[in-house]
Regions:
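Transmembrane helical cores of multi-pass secondary ion antiporters/exchangers
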Residues: 1-392
Length: 392
């Protein structure tokens, strides 16, 4: 495992640095590192680290979501109002609809199997989007119009919505009835996540005011609580649950509301943690990619992904109708909502592991979506934000 950690960090950072020098997103180099070092090519990564890959990827996601919460300016989000709510589910719903229209004909799968594929593909990647929106907020691009806040909040809730749909469709194909409680749980889990996270943030702000400890210790406390929330969500067996990822982001928001100076300092600390977490996240996502699968569906999978993205971007366009955003700002939001990586890597292989007939197709299309959209979406954002968004 020690050799694997060394390879992940050294090779991942080096190839990422080379990509950055070539004006490409560093995550592209990290993804390529994972593909090459992973079990489907050179097989240099130890099985023990691949065995905890999902947990390590989740820790990385926790780090960037907490950092996002610590720096999120809610005043910009309040200005936008209605579109902020619509961005949480309309683009994902339209993408799912697009896949339902085209996938059964092209890939020869049933409507329910297409719904499972759509639920896997319809999530935007917080691991790609969130750090870039945090960067935009720090540099002041689009903040007055609330663009990074809108995309950041929408992308986080979008994932929760899609994962609940995925669980529901998976249950249906295994013979369970589609219970209304599953759909009622979507808004409830989001609101409970907001409430629980904000309350914890406020309590921590009060605690940090009364008990003087180092900022590093504060980070460890917040990180530990975040991990506990994830474990609690995973182990809850009741029909109504809460979203741990949204709760984690709102811990940062609650802390920021009560102790802004502390939140700013902790955001810097989390930024340093993200340097290592980003490498692990994208190298391990790359390690899940089985290149051999891709040749099996090839062009048809490409068409499905392209149609899905067109439907998704149209969904973003609809959400932003009636806002004060200009054409360039809307186009940026549409591009920012295209990258896929985290959720697809986390749930793309579940149908195959359950022995479903559509499992291999779902995993293949998910893998192709990661390889194509994560670097392309990141590249589009990195290249366009200074041209498309206003500073200050």
């Amino acid at each position: 495992m020690l050799l694997s950690i060394s390879l992940i960090l050294l090779v991942g950072m080096s190839v990422g640095w080379i990509c950055k020098k070539m004006r490409l997103p560093s995550l592209l180099g990290m993804l390529v590192t994972g593909i090459v070092l992973g079990p489907y090519m050179l097989d240099l990564l130890d099985g023990s680290i691949l065995g905890i890959s999902a947990e390590l990827r989740k820790i990385a996601l926790i780090i960037i979501l907490t950092r996002a919460g610590l720096g999120l300016d809610l005043s910009g989000l309040k200005k936008i109002g209605r579109p902020a709510v619509l961005m949480c589910f309309v683009p994902a719903s339209l993408e799912l609809l697009g896949i339902l229209v085209i996938a059964p004909k092209l890939l020869g799968i049933s409507m329910l199997e297409a719904a499972i594929l759509g639920a896997v593909l319809a999530a935007v990647s917080p691991a790609v989007v969130v750090p870039r929106m945090v960067k935009l907020m720090e540099e002041g691009y689009g903040v007055r119009e609330g663009i990074p806040q809108l995309i950041l909040a929408g992308a986080s809730v979008d994932d929760v919505y899609v994962i609940v749909l995925f669980s529901t469709f998976l249950g249906m194909i295994q013979g369970e009835s589609a219970s209304i409680i599953h759909f009622i749980n979507i808004p409830i889990s989001i609101f409970l996540g907001v409430g629980i996270g904000f309350l914890i943030g406020v309590i921590l702000a009060y605690y940090f005011k009364k008990v003087h400890i180092r900022d590093t210790s504060k980070v460890l406390i917040i990180l530990s609580i975040s991990l506990l929330l994830v474990v609690l969500e995973d182990h809850l067996t009741i029909p109504i649950t809460f979203s741990a990822l949204i709760a984690i982001m709102f811990i940062g928001i609650g802390l920021q509301k009560k102790r802004e100076a502390v939140a700013r300092r902790l955001s810097v600390k989390y930024g340093k943690l993200w340097v290592a977490a980003e490498v692990f996240l994208f190298v391990l996502v790359g390690a899940t990619v089985n290149i051999g699968y891709l040749s099996k569906v090839g062009v048809k999978a490409l068409i499905v992904i392209a149609v899905a993205l067109i439907f998704r971007m149209f969904g973003v366009f609809l959400c932003l109708l009636g806002t004060s955003l200009d054409k360039k700002e809307r186009l940026f939001a549409m591009m920012a909502y295209t990258p896929k990586a985290t959720v697809q890597a986390a749930i793309g292989g579940i149908p195959l592991s359950l022995g479903l007939a559509c499992g291999e197709i779902v995993l293949t299309v998910a893998v192709l979506a990661i390889v194509l959209t994560a670097p392309a979406g990141a590249f589009a954002m990195d290249l366009s934000y200074k041209k498309f968004l206003k500073k200050g």
